């Protein structure tokens, strides 16, 4: 692929490719057929050779890393066709000593997960399934701040790359027109006073069609394609996302949670509104005051008291 891409619009003879790759002409033909089966459009002409006409929407580490210019995120990138869960692979890599900034991407997942262990539908070749390994010098109590970092990065990139008006939902969703377009799942490896690693997991619906969503979804869902009416190449989206995560991560460590919290709250439509929080065993009503430093949602209750919300589904009351 690299050889053909280095000569766009040009024909390379089978002999040139054979010599460059140190393989037989028969092996060249087999490689070309394999690439065609994977979606690469490769023209062939007698006495001229092969020419790459178009690429499938594949995520390749070399393409993502080329001129990425990040400080931490993307130092190492693993792109896999199919796996159980990008978060699981990233956690295993973290335990084995992988460097901060490792990114694990998959074309599909067989065991993608959301918050509270809920299944995350992960069809092949249409979405972004990504995990970023970080080793922040933060207290474990501050680890939830990274969930809001993921949300802000995802929402801002959806606006800038896709022309959407993305909003955030506490604690870990990104919405467009009231429908869920991305979910976030961060997983922590820590002791009482030290974070060993933190994995940022992001599932972003890019080119998913309406019939690919399960019928039993808890909340309405959407994708970039459904919102814009056109397919979106995933490469520019993932590159922009990794750059924004890197930028926000650097700012968080240098400036604290305040600036990031303000960017998140600016996209949170329930700020200063009356809501109810369904915690399963009880429903709490109040007015949203904002986020605490540990990511808890703070409510003003009807009796004037303030209460921190650590878990629950938040819904607006009235308009």
Located regions from the model:
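Hydrophobic residue at the +6 position relative to the catalytic HRD Asp in the kinase catalytic loop
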Residues: 50, 173-174
